[in-house]
Amino acid sequence: MVNNMTDLTAQEPAWQTRDHLDDPVIGELRNRFGPDAFTVQATRTGVPVVWIKREQLLEVGDFLKKLPKPYVMLFDLHGMDERLRTHREGLPAADFSVFYHLISIDRNRDIMLKVALAENDLHVPTFTKLFPNANWYERETWDLFGITFDGHPNLRRIMMPQTWKGHPLRKDYPARATEFSPFELTKAKQDLEMEALTFKPEEWGMKRGTENEDFMFLNLGPNHPSAHGAFRIVLQLDGEEIVDCVPDIGYHHRGAEKMGERQSWHSYIPYTDRIEYLGGCVNEMPYVLAVEKLAGITVPDRVNVIRVMLSELFRINSHLLYISTFIQDVGAMTPVFFAFTDRQKIYDLVEAITGFRMHPAWFRIGGVAHDLPRGWDRLLREFLDWMPKRLASYEKAALQNTILKGRSQGVAAYGAKEALEWGTTGAGLRATGIDFDVRKARPYSGYENFDFEIPVGGGVSDCYTRVMLKVEELRQSLRILEQCLNNMPEGPFKADHPLTTPPPKERTLQHIETLITHFLQVSWGPVMPANESFQMIEATKGINSYYLTSDGSTMSYRTRIRTPSYAHLQQIPAAIRGSLVSDLIVYLGSIDFVMSDVDR
């Protein structure tokens, strides 16, 4: 049952419940490195933000990793062009900065380290010596900002083509297509691009063969159906055995973070739907919550429950596609057609509520676009009566099949240590026995008031365990929806706050000031206070987060989007070496990713 629904509005926003400036880790750092070794930044992230010197980076990182309750996961790493930022009071001088977001599972706490860099000295030591998953994040930061990570094993472009000129997330780099010269693809340029895509094993430390035999290098993708999108993996093969492999991403990159600098806080909402295009409203949740932290908005009870309801509907929708396509990858065709019948019922419900199907863009800063329509409860009731029996049939007919089990049990298996090293989240992490779901560990949007369980594996994450956890997660989402149906609070669907966007239109009819405010917020967008905010959520494929920097304008100064699929694809070589090509196909199906979530 849902508890204390009417008490939600009396609670402080989650980022205010614990003062991150007094986090115990700050004292531990001061005791070890001295009180003047770093600068603590006050933000609305809810996370301790500590500026340290470049020379201290590896030492501080190693210290945090070896604490009694250690920071065991590098959750995110990226940069920012600080040159045009006007509100930097009390911060170290910087033209650029690099941030490192670490998570401690034991503490259920985070810390963010920042390093200030001058434009004429954009160098920082690589973090890969402490966290192997820093590899791709450092490549992306160099690709998009031009910051060099000394000692990196292979610092090369990852999002942009190898022939690309410039670093797109710099403030002096054009943000609109109209600012570029017209694009022309000549024969010479086409040949150059094709040559750049030619795989050269030596660049990756690979040998072309041994004394007795040559290795085969095979492209899987970027248009192979089992790659689940525009994704290439170059395989180094000894017969059918995978000696090593190199994932190649970026074909779906659209510059989503750059777009955040040219859209208003309100008009960026539709772009969030397309980060992970199966997640719908789930994608909107972290962005809208992060903006509401900046604005200091607390939404009504009804908004919280509506948001949870839409998020869980899209979670079920995504999980159904994942489970059925996994079964299809292993070789059974029928379940995917049944799943699309079930997903259609969800789309009918979502369309009735929001007016759209896949990409509703329905959450708003301070609420939702409009109230629930008449009859929504009947449609939800019909779906809740329908789905449990269908789910049982999937399990019985396909997931308990001995051939499927034989193809997936023990394949691409890893433990908790490996999952944490590679930044794995979601079912892949929980399959290793680590009980970490943001909805329970760090509740948002009122999840703490719902009664549901978090499925956890027995210690080893393999293909079969990952898919079976998703089946149980689907059941738990049905439990949450049942509680939304039975306990939907009355009340407004928007917060009564000056920065709620769009503001209530009824007030525009009363006097001119409200009409002017409404016009400005709808046309130019709301002006958010200068600060930084952060929100992570349990998305359909793992932990998704938005880290927003406001410089006191109508647009974000920096929008950082951390997606789970990016981290999960980086882990592929470590998990699949020594396996067969057929095992790789099953492994890819078990990850649950879409390339829009990877490439952004």
From Swiss-Prot:
Keywords: Cell inner membrane, Cell membrane, Membrane, Multifunctional enzyme, NAD, Quinone, Translocase, Transport, Ubiquinone. The keyword Translocase applies. Residues 1-190 are annotated as: NADH dehydrogenase I subunit C. Residues 214-600 are annotated as: NADH dehydrogenase I subunit D. It holds the Pfam family Complex1_49kDa. It catalyses: a quinone + NADH + 5 H(+)(in) = a quinol + NAD(+) + 4 H(+)(out). It comes from the Bacteria. GO terms for cellular component: NADH dehydrogenase complex; plasma membrane. InterPro entries: NADH_DH_suC, NADH_DH_suCD, NADH_Q_OxRdtase_suD, NADH_quin_OxRdtase_su_C/D-like, NADH_UbQ_OxRdtase_30kDa_su, NADH_UbQ_OxRdtase_49kDa_CS, NADH_UbQ_OxRdtase_CS, NDH1_su_D/H. NDH-1 is composed of 13 different subunits. Subunits NuoB, CD, E, F, and G constitute the peripheral sector of the complex. In the N-terminal section; belongs to the complex I 30 kDa subunit family. This is NADH-quinone oxidoreductase subunit C/D. The lineage of its organism: Bacteria, Pseudomonadati, Pseudomonadota, Gammaproteobacteria, Enterobacterales.
